Amino acid sequence: MRYDRVYNFSAGPAMMPESVLEEIAAEVLNYHGSGMSVMEMSHRSPVFQEILSQSEADLRTLMHIPDNYKVLFVQGGGTVQFAMVPMNLMKNGVACYVETGAWSKKAIAEAKRYGEVKIVASSADKNFSYLPDCSNLDIPDNADYVYICENETINGTAYHTLPDTKGKVLVADQSSLFLSRPCDVSKYGLIWAGVQKNVGPAGMAIVIIREDLIREDLPKFVPTYLRYKTHADADSLYNTPNCWSIYCCGKVFQYLLTNGGLEAMAQRNEEKATVLYDFLDRSQFFTAAVRKEDRSLMNVPFFSPSKEQDAEVAASAKAAGFDNLKGHKSVGGLRASIYNAMPKEGVEALVDFLKKYEAEHT
């Protein structure tokens, strides 16, 4: 790669498109003749107001977001959203969660602070290596919403068919597949995504919420900042937002629009993932962690024959220019995160490396 860059398979913060980084670098000292960097710019300035409004407009175009949905840029990332969702949506104090891995478990633990949580399906019995059947969930009449983690970054599963929520509001953590494929926003009540995986710099989440779910009658204990209405009423400018992340995300939105949109991204991501999964399924040395029908196209966990060899593979890969292949500490093994910005040649080069490693160790 140019600039002595490595192929970065990190689950997040993750790769950004090289052309986007070049554009950001060209503007970092003096943005569009303003005489200052976006990092130095007042969030109330007309220049930044234009950055913010254009970023939202481009995201709406990319995702075909209906007019009755608000787009919010909220500081804090996913951990804050684990709390904001139940704080804002638990009107009856009951919510249903599908337990599919590490991140849905964290969301469940946080939601239990604010009300009753019913786990309506789980794949914990097989170490989250598959997605449970969600076609006939036992959803109580008084449930406020059904929550899923649409792509489990650590465990490597992804929904390819949405659950039947029986008319209840669907809430989805889309962090690690956000903007990787087309999305019918109208099927959801709320979508949120930490941006550091597939969009831009860490420290922010994008929230897409249907307007009728933005409540004013929240319990008094809900802080002002943690109310979706606060951000919706202020157009994401209630306080100083993460200006730099908004700006960088906006650049990525423009990149996606000029490179075929989400339909083109979905095709490229399918091609990339197929290269890696086909190798893993043929390998006599490496093993894919997830059953075929539930595999993520973004996060690919896999194992070598032993923990010691997992560590050796990751170290050897790093030395060869393939960085951040070590699996998450909670599950071990190896993991290749191949988000939008990872070029197909990066995945092909990784497969060539793994083939060579296998040949030398079998």
Feature roles, as predicted:
Residues 90-105:
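Conserved PLP-anchoring active-site segment centered on the Schiff-base-forming lysine
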Residues 33-81, 88, 102, 110:
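Conserved N-terminal alpha-helix of the aminotransferase class I/II PLP-enzyme fold
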